[in-house]
């Protein structure tokens, strides 16, 4: 049996293949107010260069309060605002009264909240494994710093491990693919 085991209090992940630990890496987990849930699931797919649709909790607790003070928050964070017709709305047209009527999307890139890669699995918490734009966090001893998702220290190596397809998806190809900022869904 092959599986990933995340030890939340130890801030670590191990990959187990046929009973042997084949990979170990540091992770960042949810902070005290937005803890990473304990769950068991099966990986459904891997996204290279993913867009990030900002979840309601992060909008309400982080984005909206900052945007009220400074509309340029959307531009600084490279967030696009879309109405229900999928038309882009200017940050200067944005009003807090209408804030929940819109979708907020961060385009892919090394500095996006999801970084270069996201691993999806079914769960009721809307959490996943992903890269990060805060790579410096892995130097810290205390790493309960995310909004619930698990951030990976070596995300592209984990993608290679999960894909297990050296012929079609070696690490070099995964790295090259993330350099072009083109969204790709795998597996």
Tell where the protein language model's regions lie, with residue ranges.
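Well-ordered beta-sheet/strand-loop patches within structured domains
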Residues: 1-187
């Amino acid at each position: 049996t092959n599986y990933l085991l995340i030890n939340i209090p130890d801030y670590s992940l191990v990959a187990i293949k046929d009973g042997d630990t084949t990979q170990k890496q540091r992770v960042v987990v949810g902070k005290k107010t937005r803890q990473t849930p304990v769950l068991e699931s099966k990986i459904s797919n891997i996204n290279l260069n993913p867009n990030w649709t900002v979840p309601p909790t992060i909008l309400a607790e982080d984005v909206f309060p900052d945007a009220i003070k400074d509309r340029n928050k959307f531009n600084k964070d490279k967030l696009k605002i879309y109405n229900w017709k999928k038309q882009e709305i200017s940050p200067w047209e944005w009003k807090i009264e209408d804030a929940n009527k819109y979708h907020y999307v961060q385009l892919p890139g090394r500095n996006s909240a999801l970084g270069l890669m996201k691993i999806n699995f079914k769960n009721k918490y809307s959490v996943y494994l992903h890269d990060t734009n805060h790579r410096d966090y892995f130097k810290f001893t205390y790493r309960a710093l995310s909004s619930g998702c698990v951030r990976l220290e070596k995300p592209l190596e984990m993608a290679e491990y999960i894909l297990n397809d050296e012929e079609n998806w070696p690490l070099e190809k995964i790295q090259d693919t993330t350099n072009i900022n083109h969204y790709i869904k795998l597996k």
